[in-house]
Amino acid sequence: MKKFLSVAMLAVLPLTAMAQHEEDTENGVVSLAGREGFTIETKKGDFVFKPYLLVQTSANFNWYDDEGLDKAYNQDNIANSGFSIPYAVLGFTGKAFGKVAFNLSINAAASGGALLQQAWFDVQLKKQFAVRVGKFKTPFSHAYLTTLGETLLPQLPVSLASSVILPYSLNAVTPNIGTGFDLGVEIHGLVADKFGYEVGLFNGTGASVNTASKTMSDDWHIPSLLYAGRLTYMPKGVMPSTQGNPNRLNEDKILFGLSGSINVESENESTNDTRVGLEFALLKNKLYLAAEAYYMNVGFTKRQKINESYNFLGGYVQGGYFVAPRLQLAARYDIFNRNGTDDDGFLNMPAVGMNYFFRGCNLKLQVMYQYVARWGHDTQLDRDNDNLGLATHSATVMLQYTF
């Protein structure tokens, strides 16, 4: 019964849900306002076309604890280190007829279905109501919804991006709390310049799948999709989708957010995953602050014959401050109950970094160091298992160019 009540609550979210909205960064990569690169538009301004580019190149260092390493195969503590290209995005965005926005972008650094990073169009019937269709960011988490290239640190919080640990050997069941990009349809809008809403239906298969592969839920008898909604309250006007921008050092904005989703028959039809998140973000002149807390429940479908469900908690606090016009210092404290609330122990992950914005050329340098610590576990085995696959010490130096 509780499952059906949860679905019903999400179904009525369009009546009350409110969400973040910012016109200048609708494509999630660069501004339409013409600050980066160039824009082609008609004299009336009803047709706008803007090509854009974002390239990130990083040097990475990762050191892993001995647990999980097989010395017989000469596995080293230092691994997954060297140079990488997280994003090489080429795309175009724009507006047509004064009410239709569109975006298409390719991430050449990805593979498979993830090559198509975004592909959507958005019809704004009025400021309070618009419909978006295609591949875009799901309405969950301030960290994910921040404009790509304007994040405080080059790595997402581990509590959002890392898979949880389940006490079963099911290789196909590796959920993480963040939902990221997906294919679907969403209604959204802005009310009284303070409230907004996003409510959508998505495949729930993530950024790497561009095909229709879903069915009906055998247990709940509804389409096996991701049902998601997000609301925010911005008392001082729309919060910019940035975590640090040297051209926006006179802002005074604050955001409070609530989001939730149910992914029906996710993980290859093995689980029903429920997520809830709380958000806070603040921009006050040179200062940026943000905090998020999120919860995920993983319940198995009847065909798995596993009666237990598992709960996971995570969250982070982060802040940045411009100590000079183009130099931002950054810090984050991330915490993750990766092995579930039934077992004691958390990962706690402090990180520090800095961002330098080169004048007049759209270059950005980011530096970050993170330590993954473990606290409160009952046994040494639990402690060893909790950070499997995660680097104990990691450092990243990334150079980014956009136009």
Annotate each PLM feature.
Residues 4-56, 192, 403:
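N-terminal periplasmic/intermembrane-space "pro-region" immediately following the signal or transit peptide
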Residues 38-71, 75-207, 223-238, 318-330, ...:
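Outer membrane beta-barrel
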Residues 58-67, 107-111, 140, 202-208, ...:
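Sequence/structural signature of outer-membrane beta-barrel proteins
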Residues 87, 116-118, 182-184, 224-228, ...:
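Transmembrane beta-barrel architecture of outer membranes
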Residues 226-238, 354, 358, 363, ...:
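Outer-membrane beta-barrel "beta-signal"
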Residues 230-339:
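Detector for outer-membrane/organellar transmembrane beta-barrel domains
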Residues 316, 320, 326-374:
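Outer membrane beta-barrel transmembrane domains
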